[in-house]
A protein has these predicted regions:
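Interface-prone segments of viral and bacterial extracellular assemblies
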Residues: 2-306
């Protein structure tokens, strides 16, 4: 018996109109599947109503914050973690009273009568932040770069009926450092474990950290070697993107010329940001064309490029 049964019908025995039409493979275009929409992180700041004997609980990165309202007292309970880029973001308002940590830091504020709501306002640090690149880099004369830096934020806690904020808690508490040529010339700063990238897409995004674009211009005759950069965050406002909940500062422009550094700030949120709203004002107002060469400088080079 042969491999082909002579009694089996062949393709010629069918009505060709009943057959599937031939398809030119080269003409088939597969539409790409749409990427799933990624919802922005929940809004962890703003006004939160709390009734008497209710607790609000926020876990923002590695920091946990609880706010407890009593008839004549507000309690702020918080603890700090060690991971500056912890992705955790969880809001529970109202939460169970049992969620309050017994070993955490506690601050108590007494009033004749407490009022709702409680307000969390993101702000930047109360001191300059010193960023140390993993590897020092040089900017050649007459060149400029834009560096994107991720900055930690503080939570300013306010309550209804009280003019002044009760307290501020950092989402991550940086270590202290001294920035200056000597103990007599310089100032106390925070040592920011802050990611910094030339390409903004490579910068890790966190809803509790702000992105600061820093334009650095070298107008000196020689190379500008950067080992540490002091970011004067006290002059910066905070902006929030309505679409992504990402925080931004205005652009920082640092120009090095004849051994001195001039600071200028952009107006409003930077070009890289989406539609934004201003969330908090600067702690201090910068003078136009502020010369900060007399304030311990901005750039430091202690290791060189070797």
């Amino acid at each position: 018996m042969g491999l082909i049964d002579q009694n089996q019908p062949t393709i010629d025995d069918y009505d060709r109109s009943e057959l599937e039409p031939e398809v030119d493979v080269e003409q088939v275009v597969l539409e790409p599947e749409p990427e799933p929409e990624v919802a922005p992180p929940p809004r962890w700041w703003g006004d939160f109503p709390l009734e008497e004997y209710q607790v609000g609980r926020w876990q923002v990165g590695s920091m946990t914050l609880s706010i407890y309202r009593l008839p004549r007292e507000w309690r702020i309970i918080y603890s700090q973690g060690n991971d500056p880029l912890d992705p955790t973001l969880d809001i529970d308002v109202p939460a169970e009273v049992e969620a309050i940590g017994i070993d955490d830091n506690v601050r108590r504020y007494m009033f004749s009568q407490t009022q709702s709501p409680v307000t969390l306002t993101p702000v930047l640090a109360d001191r300059p932040l010193v960023v140390r690149p993993a590897i020092p880099f040089a900017i050649e004369t007459r060149e400029e770069i834009t560096l994107y830096v991720s900055l930690p934020m503080w939570l300013r806690i306010s309550v209804a009926g009280v003019q002044q904020p009760l307290y501020e808690v950092p989402s991550f508490r940086p270590s202290d450092t001294w920035f200056g040529d000597s103990t007599l010339q310089g100032e106390l700063c925070y040592a920011a474990r802050a990611p910094a990238q030339l390409n903004i897409s490579e910068l890790p995004k966190r809803p509790y950290r702000a992105i600061a674009p820093i334009l650095i211009r070298n107008r000196d005759e020689g190379s500008l070697v950067l080992d540490r950069i002091k970011i004067p965050v006290e002059y910066l406002a905070l902006y929030n993107s309505k679409e992504t909940n990402q925080f931004w500062t205005q652009k920082i422009i640092l120009e090095q010329n004849n051994g001195r550094t001039k600071l200028r700030l952009g107006w409003g949120s930077p070009q890289e940001a989406d539609k934004t709203e201003r969330v908090s004002a600067p702690r201090e107002r910068a003078r136009r064309g502020l010369d900060i060469g007399a304030f311990g400088g901005i750039f430091r080079n202690t290791r060189g490029l070797d």
